[in-house]
């Protein structure tokens, strides 16, 4: 079983910087402003030959249990309960504060092994803070600089001393684990031959996106059946894109909770800009994006812009009408919402839209059934023979128009990629092909090969002119 380490401390001592250093990627948002991290985030990490899972946590603050800070503290306590070892981080440059003393007592009560980490020790002013740290009663401080990567060898040794060599290296006895940077943004080229088999062993990456306060984190907590993510009435609670592993009916899922996306004109703070960039990366890394609409006020301009972004990125869009428990005339409302989906988002015909209540856990199975169905379609490959049989029929039924007195000729079609399905048509004079005829072909592909509800790409290529080379030879 993998060693799990939680990074704990008051706000702005460098916990997220240390987390990013250990995982080898800039996953957690980092800013000079205190309280950037709100939810706990877990990821595979490596420190030289030592491998483990590390949890980044919200800064511990003294506040009532029902306040935002109090709920953040509950998330940190849950991380402490999950962990085998705690890295208690303090700011050596600033020295020990009353909050450090208070929270050191809380961490000691957990009974877990603790390594006291003196961060920002590259500063000349840090020596005094390291001496003060003995007052915490957590043993000898380990001086490091997470920002500059200093002292990490000593941190490795301190972790091994705290848990013992056998526990520290238990993961190495299992199959080697490689940590790779997340690939972001690019469509996945599929160069395999036809007849690609759908691989159910791979986890599906699902991002939960939407404007602020539509219930994204509440929905994920209902899926997991635990208070894994911070929720509340305040808009904009989520800042990082948090990934959580889940299993639904035997299928492995990786869920990404994202920060709410507002209109550009309202995004002013540097921290919110970082959150938005993190959300956009999560959308591009995902395969399926659940766009959460507030059913009591759906189809706001920002809802449609987020849906359009997901479609342009080529991901599988699925709309979740959340807060359905607040809707009175549910049947008539659902008919109206489906009609609006078709009217406001015509670029993806047959878009899946599911009513649900994240608060009460209603409609989640229906949502997941639609996700699984659309994910299969998104991965679909169609044989070239079937495509050209279809093309012959549709062109005979409705040939392309004549341009400047010359009829356009559509000759050949093949599928060049999946995820999303992409097709290339060989034709004469592709630059003058009307967009209306391209839409006719795309809609025909959707209908014939059952590809409704996902983006479909269609590109044109000029067919070879056999007389062009002869003319050049003359």
Curated annotation (Swiss-Prot):
Keywords: GTP-binding, Nucleotide-binding, Repeat, Ribosome biogenesis. It comes from Bartonella tribocorum (strain CIP 105476 / IBS 506). The keyword Transmembrane helix does not apply. The keyword Magnesium does not apply. It comes from the Bacteria. GTP 2 binds at residues 210-217, 257-261, 322-325. InterPro entries: G_ENGA, GTP-bd, GTPase_Der, KH_dom-like, KH_dom-like_a/b, P-loop_NTPase, Small_GTP-bd. Residues 3-167, 204-379 form the EngA-type G domain. This is GTPase Der. GO terms for biological process: ribosome biogenesis.
């Amino acid at each position: 079983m993998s060693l799990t380490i939680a990074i704990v401390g008051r706000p702005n001592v460098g916990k997220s910087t240390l987390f990013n250093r250990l995982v080898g990627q800039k996953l957690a948002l980092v800013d000079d402003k205190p309280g950037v991290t709100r939810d706990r985030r877990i990821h595979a990490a490596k420190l030289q030959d030592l491998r483990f899972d590390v949890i980044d946590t919200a800064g511990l603050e003294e506040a009532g249990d029902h306040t935002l800070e109090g709920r953040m503290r509950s998330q940190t306590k849950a991380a402490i309960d999950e962990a085998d070892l705690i890295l208690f981080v303090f700011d050596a440059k600033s020295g020990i504060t009353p909050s450090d003393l208070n929270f050191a007592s809380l961490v000691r009560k957990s009974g877990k092994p603790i390594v006291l980490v003196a961060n920002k020790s590259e500063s000349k002013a840090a020596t005094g803070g390291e001496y003060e740290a003995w007052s915490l009663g957590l043993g000898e401080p380990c001086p490091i600089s997470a920002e500059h990567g200093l002292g990490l060898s000593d941190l490795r040794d301190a972790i091994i001393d705290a848990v013992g060599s056998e526990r520290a290296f238990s993961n190495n006895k299992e199959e080697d684990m490689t940590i790779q940077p997340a690939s972001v943004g690019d469509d996945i080229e599929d160069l395999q031959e036809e007849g690609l088999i759908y691989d159910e062993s791979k986890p599906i990456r699902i991002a939960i996106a939407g404007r602020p306060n539509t219930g994204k984190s509440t929905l994920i907590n209902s899926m997991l059946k635990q208070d894994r993510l911070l929720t509340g009435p305040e808009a904009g609670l989520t800042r990082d894109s948090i990934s959580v592993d889940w299993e639904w009916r035997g299928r492995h899922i990786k869920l990404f909770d994202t920060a709410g996306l507002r209109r550009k004109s309202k995004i002013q703070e540097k921290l919110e800009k970082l959150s938005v960039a993190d959300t956009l990366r999560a959308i591009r890394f995902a395969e399926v994006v659940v766009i959460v609409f507030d059913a009591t006020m759906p189809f706001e301009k920002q809802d449609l812009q987020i849906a359009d972004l997901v479609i342009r990125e080529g991901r599988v869009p699925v709309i979740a009408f959340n807060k359905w428990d607040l809707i009175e005339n549910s049947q008539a409302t659902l008919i109206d919402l489906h009609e609006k989906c078709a009217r406001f988002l015509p670029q993806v015909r047959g878009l899946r839209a599911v009513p649900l209540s994240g608060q009460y856990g209603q409609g989640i199975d229906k949502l997941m059934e639609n996700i699984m169905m659309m994910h299969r379609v998104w991965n679909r490959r169609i044989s070239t023979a079937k495509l050209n049989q279809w093309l012959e029929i549709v062109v005979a039924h409705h040939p392309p128009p004549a341009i400047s007195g010359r009829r356009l000729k559509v000759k050949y079609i093949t599928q060049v990629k999946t995820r999303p399905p992409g097709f290339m048509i060989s034709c004469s004079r592709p630059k003058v092909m009307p967009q209306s005829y391209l839409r006719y072909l795309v809609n025909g592909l959707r209908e014939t090969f059952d590809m409704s509800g996902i983006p479909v790409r269609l590109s044109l290529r000029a067919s070879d002119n056999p007389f062009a080379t002869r003319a050049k030879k003359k």
